[in-house]
Structure formats: structure tokens, C-alpha cells
């Protein structure tokens, strides 16, 4: 199965804010969509995270994208909407010590995110699809498929509006 994993365009939010599940809009959606439409095969089904920054792009790529909650970004719990500089140092250190397993207070861990993202992919029955989602979802999926140890996960970085195409064994 061929998947085109697309990170949403840049969100309209102040720099330095943790915004995982915050439902903020994105900037420059039509321009990003035009670029992707020129690159992607035509007529593919499109799935999207329900958050506006993904959904708006998905709606430019397909007249009726399918929305799936499993594609939403990691839940950062009490960190949501907080400046990264204001997140308690001890909590950030705990996350750095256990990149995959640590969950922010009231949130989920990257491993939890990875489980739901893999369940989404396992549910697909099409040979090729476009998935509009978030960096965390793309990162945990690629880390799984590439067999990367959790300490290497932060090396996987994706630009806003970027496309990563992978072939996933069934």
C-alpha cells in the first residue's frame, strides 16, 4: 500500500506555544494545496485529522475527505496552549529521558499515539491514499516502519505542508 503522508500547513498560532490538540487554523492553505495537487496522483482517496489545520488542506485536495480521529496530533495534556518555556523543566527532562513512553500530565505518550496511528493504517483497504495529519503521527509511523529506536525519533522532522510517500507492507 502506498501512502502519501502530508503534514498540515503552518498553524496560525504564536511561536513557542505547545499546540498539539489545539484546533488552530493554518496559513496559506490554497498555495500548499496547489503544490500538492501538482505532485500527487489524481483521484486518490484522502483521509484527514479532524483538526482545522489538516481538514482545511484535505478539503482542497478532495471534495469529500474522510475524517478520522486516530489521525489527530498527540495529546499534550496540561501542556496544551502553554509556552514551551513555561512547561516545568522536570516534566521536559522526564520526556527527554523516555521519548516514546512519557506522557505529559493528562496527555498521551508517543507510543500511545503510535498505536492508534498504526490501527488507522491497518484499517485501510485501498492500494494508495493521501493522509493529511501531524508531525507526531508521521514521525511515529515512520519510526515503526523503519525500526528506529525511540531515542532516534526526534531526528524525524517534517516541514509544514510536506509530503512523505511510503510503501507499507500489508
Predicted regions and their residues:
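Active-site catalytic microenvironments for nucleophilic, acid-base chemistry
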Residues: 60, 123, 144-148
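Loop-to-helix element that buttresses phosphate recognition and phosphoryl-transfer chemistry
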Residues: 2-57, 105-117
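Short, active-site-adjacent cap segments at secondary-structure transitions
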Residues: 12, 53-55, 73, 137-140
Amino acid at each position: 500500500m502506498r501512502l502519501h503522508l502530508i503534514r498540515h500547513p503552518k498553524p496560525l498560532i504564536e511561536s513557542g506555544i505547545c499546540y498539539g490538540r489545539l484546533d488552530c487554523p493554518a496559513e496559506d492553505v490554497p498555495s500548499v494545496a496547489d503544490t500538492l495537487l501538482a505532485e500527487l496522483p489524481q483521484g486518490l482517496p484522502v483521509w484527514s485529522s479532524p483538526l482545522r489545520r489538516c481538514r482545511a488542506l484535505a478539503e482542497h485536495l478532495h471534495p469529500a475527505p474522510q475524517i478520522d480521529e486516530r489521525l489527530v496530533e498527540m495529546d499534550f495534556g496540561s501542556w496544551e496552549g502553554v509556552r514551551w518555556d513555561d512547561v516545568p523543566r522536570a516534566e521536559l527532562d522526564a520526556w527527554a529521558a523516555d521519548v516514546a513512553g512519557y506522557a505529559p500530565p493528562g496527555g498521551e505518550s508517543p507510543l500511545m499515539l503510535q498505536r492508534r496511528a498504526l490501527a488507522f493504517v491497518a484499517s485501510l483497504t485501498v492500494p494508495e491514499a493521501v493522509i493529511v495529519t501531524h508531525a507526531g503521527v508521521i514521525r511515529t509511523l515512520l519510526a515503526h516502519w523503519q525500526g528506529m529506536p525511540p531515542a532516534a525519533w526526534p531526528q524525524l522532522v517534517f516541514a509544514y505542508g510536506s509530503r512523505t510517500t511510503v510503501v507499507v507492507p500489508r
